[in-house]
């Protein structure tokens, strides 16, 4: 009976730790989403947004490593590390995607999509001026196909309602969270050293 209670306490602690770490990571990812959304209006913010996006795995690693070091145990097995990491990404995804949905639904009112379409048109005009220098018809045809595919993709993305964009964010966040959780768990796991 005691063993079951101890296991239950451990599971609750894992969930509590994952929720806490997921909240911190979710706040960081929310800031990344907001800075990325602002890059449509202020292009110079791209210099901040790209390092912030690349910093998501680093922040997740630092959070898990901090928990591992504060745990004060010499043994932090891979399964425990992986469960904490994957649950951290799950809770971070829930928080950040909820905030992204609220932003897109009630604050943005289509400004993000309009900004994307405006940037797409500027890019296409710039590339068309460059394409006039092409002499190879095959290269020109390949360029036209690529531009049309880009236009269709951006138009499709901009036509999504806030719930559709949020579903895309959830899917991509969970996919990348699963991949990153395996890598981070491998790095943060500690084996028991037998002396």
Predicted regions and their residues:
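Alpha-helical transmembrane segments of multipass membrane proteins
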Residues: 24-32, 55-56, 92-100, 176, ...
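Short helix-terminus and kink motifs of transmembrane alpha helices
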Residues: 61, 65, 101, 105, ...
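Functional transmembrane-helix hotspots
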Residues: 99-137
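Individual transmembrane alpha-helix segments
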Residues: 143-176
């Amino acid at each position: 009976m005691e063993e079951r209670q101890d296991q239950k306490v451990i599971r609750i602690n894992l969930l509590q730790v994952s929720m806490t770490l997921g909240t911190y990571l979710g706040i960081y990812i929310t800031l990344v989403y907001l800075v990325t959304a602002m890059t449509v209006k202020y292009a110079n913010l791209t210099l901040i947004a790209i390092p912030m996006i690349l910093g998501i795995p680093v922040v997740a690693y630092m959070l898990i490593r901090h928990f591992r070091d504060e745990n004060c145990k010499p043994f932090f097995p891979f399964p425990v590390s992986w469960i904490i990491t994957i649950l951290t990404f799950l809770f971070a995804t829930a928080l950040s995607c909820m905030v992204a949905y609220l932003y897109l639904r009630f604050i943005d009112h289509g400004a993000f999509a309009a900004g994307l379409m405006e940037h797409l048109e500027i890019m296409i005009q710039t590339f068309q001026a460059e394409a006039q220098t092409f002499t190879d018809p095959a290269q020109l045809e390949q360029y036209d196909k690529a531009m049309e595919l880009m236009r269709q993709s951006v138009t499709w993305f901009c036509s999504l309602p806030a719930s559709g964009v949020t579903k895309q964010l959830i899917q991509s966040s969970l996919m990348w969270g699963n991949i990153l959780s395996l890598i981070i768990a491998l790095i943060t796991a500690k084996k028991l050293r037998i002396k």
